């Protein structure tokens, strides 16, 4: 049986396990179905259900947090893989 050409794992810039526990600042153009920036503390990367987006999008579960780190809601979000890249450290 040949692999399904429509199933492509997400092309994440880091291994999925390195995303768990991280806080991502996701701009609205990198998160489907959102119209404002999302602060997300990642609890799970859903590789299996993310294979239908050409490798460009991934489903992330996590806690939406405010600027103080307080959890507002538990969410599942479809995020562009570019939003999962490590951010460079802030310069002093």
Regions found by a protein language model. Name each.
Residues 15-43:
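Short coil-to-beta transition motif at edge beta-strands of beta-rich domains
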Residues 1-4, 90-92:
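Short, intrinsically disordered, low-complexity terminal/loop segments
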Residues 14-15, 50:
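Beta-strand elements of modular eukaryotic interaction domains
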Residues 61-92:
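Intrinsically disordered, low-complexity, charged/polar segments
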Residues 54-61:
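Short aromatic-glycine-enriched beta-strand elements
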Residues 2-14:
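Short alpha-helix capping/helix-loop boundary micro-motifs
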Residues 37, 57, 74-76:
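Short edge beta-strand segments in beta-sheet-rich domains
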Residues 46-53, 67-69:
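Short, conserved beta-turn/loop elements at beta-strand boundaries and strand-helix junctions
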């Amino acid at each position: 049986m040949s692999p399904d050409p429509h199933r492509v794992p997400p092309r994440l810039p880091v291994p999925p396990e390195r995303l768990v526990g991280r806080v991502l600042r996701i701009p609205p153009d990198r998160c489907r179905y959102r119209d404002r920036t999302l602060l997300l503390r990642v609890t799970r990367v859903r590789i299996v259900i993310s294979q239908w987006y050409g490798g460009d999008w991934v489903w992330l579960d996590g806690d939406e947090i405010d600027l103080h780190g307080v959890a507002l809601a538990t969410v599942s979000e479809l995020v562009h893989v570019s939003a999962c890249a490590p951010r460079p450290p802030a310069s002093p």
